[in-house]
Amino acid sequence: MKEKTFICILALCCLLGGCGAAHKAPTGNPPFREGRQLTVWSAYWDCQESVTVIDRCTDRISAVSLFAAYFRDGALFLPEETQETLRALRRSDAGDPKPIYLSVVNDVTEGEKTIQKDTEILRSVLSPHQAEGHARELVALAKEYGFDGIEIDYEKLREDPDLWEQFLSFEEILLSLAQEAGLKVRIILEPGIPVKTLSFPQGAAYVVMCYNLHGIGTEPGPKADLAFLRALYDRFAGLPNLSFALANGGFDWEEASGKAVSLTEKDAAALAEAHQVLPRRDAASGALSFSYTQDSTRHTVWYADSETLALWAAELDACAGKTVPISIWRVD
């Protein structure tokens, strides 16, 4: 565990431009720029390691988003692990406090059953007669536990005009209540939404997910490539207070079935080492890939490392003509 944590700290600090002379990022890897606004996600299942990494790289991190509150048996639920991460971060950053957001997702758990990205719960809580109550509940939850902001990560709205109308009305209410309570608001946006037909209000930070070019249900490939990033920037450039979310790690595709399994960067590197293969860096994306055979079945792996993320961030900077805010999924 100690070795794993050290590797994670070193990789993130290199990514953020915080490596000392003894631990420089690879040659040609543009570090994340000084002065970049950088938010990192911490997931509730990685509490202890996340706190260690964030604490070691605290001077490079602008904000933290704790993933996540969700719906359990019809009510908002905040995992104890998320609460403990918040307490630990507050203890460690007492001399340098940074905003900590409560991330809220539309995952639903009922008994032993879990539905991820459930749109039915959204149709309920965003409906005209429940939207204000839902917004008040979110603000109360964030204030109760001492968060500095609320992050709305409601997904799979896709091109449903009625659901988007409800969401935007809810957002207006949330922004008003959050402002009264002294809370910040971040809105996470999937890359495929019909952004050109939607009128998002001022007051929130808008974060575009830039990491689902390939994944579960697709052919093997990187989470993003440079052309994908340029296209996303062009589509979303008109939004106010815009930033971009990048993700490390990747997927392992089983060629016979097409099934994909998510991998962290460390998992992918360990898999390559175990099968004695050397990953190759793709020029179009900066991502790493390799293939291996196990139990007579061919597998293909694509994943992003710190050099990949730095390249993606630099491409977005070039599109914007400035250093853009970046969020990273996730500290692992």
Residue ranges with predicted function:
Residues R123-I150, L177, E190-G192, K196-S199:
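An active-site-proximal structural segment forming one wall of the substrate-binding cleft
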Residues Q48-G74, L138-I150, W312-S327:
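Catalytic domains of carbohydrate-active enzymes, especially glycoside hydrolases
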Residues L38-S42, S62-L66, I100-V104, I150-I152, ...:
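Hydrophobic faces of well-ordered beta-strands that scaffold small-molecule active sites
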Residues H134-E165, Y206-N212:
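Active-site groove signature of glycoside hydrolases
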Residues L16-G18:
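C-terminal motif of bacterial Sec signal peptides marking the signal peptidase cleavage site
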Residues H23-H134:
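Glycan-recognition patch characteristic of GH18 chitinases/ENGases
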Residues W41-A43, D73-E81, D160, W164-A274:
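Substrate-binding surface in catalytic domains of secreted glycosidases
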Residues T109-I121, N248-W312:
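Glycan-binding loop/region signatures in secreted carbohydrate-active enzymes
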